[in-house]
């Protein structure tokens, strides 16, 4: 998808803007609320979320990989969560932050996200969290940037969009 067809601004006022984000699974009006759904345990079924009016959801590719594996590749993320709108997947950065590591490389995670045909994918990052030295936090950000560049270099033109993870941290 070309950059000029990815996002269109329909109205702007001062620093704000309203627009339409285009994906392989439809249009998303922005700004948008984006519900997070668990790929295994859905309290509210994804179909119901679509009926309510949400055009985009976010789910976790790492959990999808661990619980569904090859089935997710065969069915795609839309089939796994039973949702026909746009889907964004996070690659497991929170799990890295929470548990210290995940048992998949960033490159393998990116390949998985490609294969499950998520509309918007986020490369596996190394979150900075809180309490790291400035040097350590910088090394985590540098590692994330390196992975993001490699992911983009290896991406294919299939309409899938890659988004950079937001890094926190307490240092300037």
Where are these regions (language model features)?
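Eukaryote-skewed repeat-based solenoidal scaffolds used as protein-protein interaction platforms
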Residues: 148, 155-157, 162-172
């Amino acid at each position: 998808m070309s950059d000029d067809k990815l996002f269109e601004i329909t109205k702007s006022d001062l620093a704000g803007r309203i627009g339409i984000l285009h994906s392989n699974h439809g249009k998303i009006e922005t700004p948008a609320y984006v519900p997070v759904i668990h790929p295994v345990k859905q309290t509210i079924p994804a179909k119901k979320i679509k009926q309510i009016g949400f055009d985009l959801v976010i789910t976790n590719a790492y959990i999808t990989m661990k619980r569904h594996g090859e089935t997710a590749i065969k069915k795609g993320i839309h089939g796994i969560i039973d949702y026909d709108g746009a889907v964004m997947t996070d690659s497991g950065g929170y799990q890295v932050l929470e548990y210290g590591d995940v048992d998949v490389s960033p490159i393998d995670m990116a390949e998985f996200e490609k294969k499950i045909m998520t509309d918007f994918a986020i490369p596996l990052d190394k979150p900075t969290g809180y309490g790291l030295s400035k040097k350590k936090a910088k090394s985590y950000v540098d590692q994330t940037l390196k992975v993001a560049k490699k992911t983009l270099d290896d991406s294919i033109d299939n309409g899938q969009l890659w988004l950079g993870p937001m890094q926190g941290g307490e240092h300037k």
